[in-house]
């Protein structure tokens, strides 16, 4: 992709992820330039892509842009087993009148973003004037962070008998 962009003078958008971080990365107000030592192949490939994007911008002038997305959630796409899918799956359980078994530990906060907001962020970045960009590897973006109990409390306002347990 980057080599084709270099050859044809195209801009490249690469979605990255907070999965590019690791345990040593600061969890609060994560700096734009920070330590990235992920422990998963997913995270390693995201860091690799960020570094390659930076390299192609610096070496060849390829217009590379990326966003480090948090977990993306949607009311349209059914949960598919990802880490953040519990935040959608819990509503399916509530609507079906089922007890929800939460895969997370109590008090686990996760950063998430609504899919239309994620798309708008990507579009805004691609429409930005190139000379105004300070980074080429990836931009941190944030939207919301909550734990399972917060969602459960909100659901109980509408479905008082709703029950959630932890694995």
Residue spans for each PLM region:
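Hydrophobic positions on the long internal alpha-helix
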Residues: 1-5, 12, 52-53, 121, ...
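Conserved Rossmann-fold NAD(P)-dependent oxidoreductase catalytic core, especially the SDR/UDP-sugar
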Residues: 1-40
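Structural signature of the Rossmann-like NAD(P)-dependent dehydrogenase/reductase core
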Residues: 12-16, 20, 65-71, 111, ...
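Active-site helix of classical SDR
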Residues: 41, 45
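Hydrophobic alpha-helix immediately C-terminal to the catalytic Tyr-X-X-X-Lys motif of short-chain
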Residues: 48, 52, 56, 86, ...
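C-terminal substrate-binding subdomain of Rossmann-fold SDR/epimerase-dehydratase oxidoreductases
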Residues: 103-105, 111-167
């Amino acid at each position: 992709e980057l080599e084709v962009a270099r050859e044809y003078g195209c801009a490249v958008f690469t979605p990255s992820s907070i999965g590019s971080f690791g345990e040593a990365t600061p969890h609060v107000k994560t700096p734009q330039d920070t330590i990235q030592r992920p422990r998963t192949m997913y995270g390693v490939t995201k860091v690799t892509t960020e570094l390659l994007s930076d390299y192609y911008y610096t070496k060849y002038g390829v217009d590379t842009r990326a966003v480090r997305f948090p977990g993306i959630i949607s009311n349209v796409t059914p949960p598919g087993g990802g880490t953040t899918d519990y935040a959608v799956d819990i509503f399916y359980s509530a609507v079906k009148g089922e007890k929800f078994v939460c895969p997370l530990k109590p008090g686990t906060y996760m950063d998430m973003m609504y899919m239309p907001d994620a798309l708008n962020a990507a579009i805004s970045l691609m429409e930005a004037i190139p000379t105004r960009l300070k980074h080429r590897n990836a931009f941190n973006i944030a939207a919301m962070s909550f734990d399972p109990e917060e969602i459960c409390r909100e659901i109980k306002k509408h479905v008082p008998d709703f029950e959630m347990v932890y694995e």
